[in-house]
UniProtKB/Swiss-Prot annotation:
There is a cross-link at K630 (Glycyl lysine isopeptide (Lys-Gly) (interchain with G-Cter in SUMO1)). The modification Phosphothreonine is found at T472, T523. It is found in: Cytoplasm; Nucleus, Nucleoplasm; Nucleus, PML body; Nucleus, Nucleolus. A motif (Nuclear localization signal) lies at residues 391-395, 622-628. Changing S502A: No effect on phosphorylation by HIPK1. Residues 732-739 are annotated as: Sumo interaction motif (SIM). GO terms for biological process: androgen receptor signaling pathway; apoptotic signaling pathway; cell population proliferation; cellular response to cadmium ion; cellular response to copper ion; cellular response to diamide; cellular response to heat; cellular response to sodium arsenite. This is Death domain-associated protein 6. It holds the Pfam family DAXX_hist_bd.
Length: 739
């Protein structure tokens, strides 16, 4: 009998819950619960009369719950109207969900409890009204009447079997009552299990709260039975219990989390592939993150099933794009779910304005230190595995390169030697020849492996780019040095216009003359071309080569009419205008510049010509320069007449004695060196230990490269630069014009 009493209490559980609720009035006692033993046995065996009595009592309690639920629902809608005035579609949406819900659920104590809780929390926290609206919508959708219509096709059969004017409402009521009766019998049969599972859920929730409030020591991190792991195990059990409870109650297990939302995918142009990928990422069960292989297999299956006829390379591209898009979408969904569900019951009462770290500086400092420590450790882990990945990729690249070099070996020393000895296009041509031959041999050997060929070509292109960068850097350094010398020449040109020159030491001249052969040895081609214009210096009795002798005689013949007809100023202006196109050729290859300027020193000046005591030109002077012209010999004769003892004093020229002042009009200077004043301007060196030095610069335009060596020797004799170009620009000293 004790068991019968307990069973009766479980059957009338709705009445007990109704009595516990504050809303409805006290219900009349059920006569079946106080009846004698035969009545109990009849109810237990399932006779018809006790069922009718129980049905009448249940119908009365349902009517009371239904009225109370309608009242609470109307109050909630009024609250939603005031709080969601910006979104007027919320209230009609809730009305629609209520109409679609099951009548049994609308008249149940569960719905009454949900409405009471949602209404109380909404009044307490109006800012979270949409959260509670979402909770109510989830419950109403879970108890929607759509599922019950599919399970009861008897209504359609009865309507077909009836006459032309059948009564539609009574059959629907009958089917509803039958469904509710069968549902009640089924739920009553498992009510004991439901009650037991609910008790277990309450026990698990209390234990999880206790473990969350417990402090976790660092020594417990390696403990397999730490409080954190216990909490995780209890949460997994609680999820399984919740799923089982939803099955017994015949309701949906969806809780409205972001992670439960379905992700639509429209990333590709093929609907079949989109459907397959969408089915993959929305697969029920655990939230598993698909990898690239899963996405590729899904794309291949869709292409094979629907005969898309796509090549494998295009399938791989589709899979790569889809994997990136799917990964971003899944990551965003997980991040939002973490934000919405982060924390525990300890953070339920948290408000942004009552953060304890705002009032406690020690706590705020500790939180900042912990955050910094966490970010540093995270960066260390990421950098560690990134370096491991880089090392692995580098090792694979080296193995592949060794394998390629083993199939087609090529010597690597000739390109390096050519890059060191020759600069410019000639050097680059010598470097590109081995690489192109290497590419041809690799194409012949590895025609079947497309990936290896692509990698090899990319590596060759990188090597060529590095070699080109080195060559351009050398050219830029030389151009910068020449520009600095040009700036020094321009400064000295202003001093020459005033009639002053700075003294220079002979050691600088000899040092630069000794460095000249090193510049001349850069390219063999430059040496060969330089040999065409050079005249070796020899004693007076030595025999000269016929070409050099002809060049000297022709140069003298060309120079005499120029000197006799035109003034030095007009000659210089014409030659400067001819040299102007050379400004556009600054960025021309080094090969052309070196071939056209065989005797240029490091600082941009020409070969130093020194005058000895007896007025003759020393034998080492014309090693790399053209022979002196007739005018130059006349100047040295005049200089020789003014020598006094050990001092070298240059007397004024005939033009300055006559009062003629030579001035250079401001013209754009050549790119390699600035043109100084004319050679017959007054120059004076006060130091007795210095020699008279004049430097000539040959800067013909590219159009004059194919002319005869006589014209080049003529230009070398006429173009004069300042003495200051032979020394450092910082060491220029402007002397006074006092006699």
């Amino acid at each position: 009998m004790a068991t019968d009493d307990s069973i009766i209490v479980l059957d009338d559980d709705d009445e007990d819950e109704a009595a516990a609720q504050p809303g409805p009035s006290n219900l009349p006692p059920n006569p079946a619960s106080t009846g004698p033993g035969p009545g109990l046995s009849q109810q237990a065996t399932g006779l018809s009369e006790p069922r009718v009595d129980g049905g009448s009592s249940n119908s009365g309690s349902r009517k009371c719950y239904k009225l109370d639920n309608e009242k609470l629902f109307e109050e909630f809608l009024e609250l939603c109207k005031t709080e969601t005035s910006d979104h007027p579609e919320v209230v009609p949406f809730l009305h629609k969900l209520q109409q679609r819900a099951q009548s049994v659920f609308l008249a149940s104590a569960e719905f009454c409890n949900i409405l009471s809780r949602v209404l109380a929390r909404s009044r307490k926290r109006p800012a979270k009204i949409y959260v509670y609206i979402n909770e109510l919508c989830t419950v109403l959708k879970a108890h929607s009447i759509k599922k019950k219509l599919n399970l009861a096709p008897a209504a359609s059969t009865t309507s077909e079997a009836s006459g032309p004017n059948p009564p539609t409402e009574p059959p629907s009521d009958l089917t509803n009552t039958e469904n509710t009766a069968s549902e009640a019998s089924r739920t009553r049969g498992s009510r004991r299990q439901i009650q037991r599972l609910e008790q277990l859920l309450a026990l698990y929730v209390a234990e999880i709260r206790r473990l969350q409030e417990k402090e976790l020591d660092l020594s417990e991190l390696d403990d397999p039975d730490s409080s954190y792991l216990q909490e995780a195990r209890l949460k997994r059990k609680l999820i399984r219990l919740f799923g089982r409870l939803c099955e017994l109650k015949d309701c949906s297990s969806l809780t409205g989390r972001v992670i439960e939302q379905r992700i639509p995918y429209r990333g590709t142009r093929y609907p079949e592939v989109n459907r397959r990928i969408e089915r993959l990422i929305n697969k029920p069960g655990l939230d598993t993150f698909p990898d690239y292989g899963d996405v590729l297999r899904a794309v291949e299956k869709a292409a094979t099933r629907h005969s898309l006829g796509l090549p494998r390379q295009q399938l791989q591209l589709l899979a790569q794009d889809a994997f990136r898009d799917v990964g971003v979408r899944l990551q965003e969904r997980r991040h939002l779910d973490l934000i919405y569900n982060f924390g525990c019951h300890l953070t339920d009462d948290y408000r942004p304005g009552v953060d304890p770290a705002l009032s406690d500086p020690t706590l705020a400092r500790r939180l900042r230190e912990n955050r910094t420590l966490a970010m540093n450790r995270l960066d260390e882990v990421i950098s560690k595995y990134a370096m491991m990945q880089d090392k692995t990729e580098e090792g694979e690249r080296q193995k592949r390169r060794a394998r390629l070099l083993g199939t087609a070996p090529q010597p690597s020393d000739p390109p390096q030697a050519s890059s060191e000895s020759g600069e410019g296009p000639s050097g680059m041509a010598s470097q590109e020849c081995p690489t192109t031959s290497k590419a041809e041999t690799d194409d012949d050997d590895d025609d079947d492996d497309d990936d290896d060929e692509d990698n090899e070509e990319s590596e060759e292109e990188e090597e060529e780019e590095e070699e080109e960068k080195e060559a351009t850097e050398d050219e830029d350094e030389d151009l910068e040095q020449l520009q600095e010398d040009q700036g020094g020449d321009e400064e000295e040109e202003g001093g020459d216009n005033e009639g002053n020159e700075s003294p220079t030491s002979p050691s600088d001249f000899f040092h630069r003359r000794n460095s000249e052969p090193a510049e001349g040895l850069r390219t063999p081609e430059g040496q060969q071309k330089r040999g065409l214009t050079e005249t070796p210096a020899s004693p007076p009795g030595a025999s000269l080569d016929p070409p050099s002798t002809d060049a000297e005689s022709s140069g003298e013949q060309l120079l005499e009419p120029l000197l006799g007809d035109e003034s030095p100023v007009s000659q210089l202006a014409e030659l400067e205008m001819e040299a102007l196109p050379e400004e556009r050729d600054i960025s021309s290859p080094r090969k052309k510049s070196e071939d056209s300027l065989p005797t240029i020193l490091e600082n941009g000046a020409a070969v130093v010509t020194s005058t000895s005591v007896n007025g003759r030109v020393s034998s080492h002077t014309w090693r790399d320069a053209s022979p002196p012209s007739k005018r130059f010999r006349k100047e040295k004769k005049q200089l020789g007449s003014g020598l006094l003892g050990n001092s070298y004093i240059k007397e004024p020229m005939a033009q300055q004695d006559s009062g003629q002042n030579t001035s250079v009009q401001p013209m754009p200077s050549p790119p390699l060196a600035s043109v100084a004043s004319v050679a017959d301007s007054s120059t004076r060196v006060d130091s007795p230990s210095h020699e008279l030095v004049t430097s000539s610069l040959c800067s013909p335009s590219p159009s004059l490269l194919l002319q005869t060596p006589q014209a080049q020797s003529l230009r070398q004799c006429i173009y004069k630069t300042s003495v200051a170009t032979q020394c450092d620009p910082e060491e220029i000293i402007v002397l006074s014009d006092s006699d």
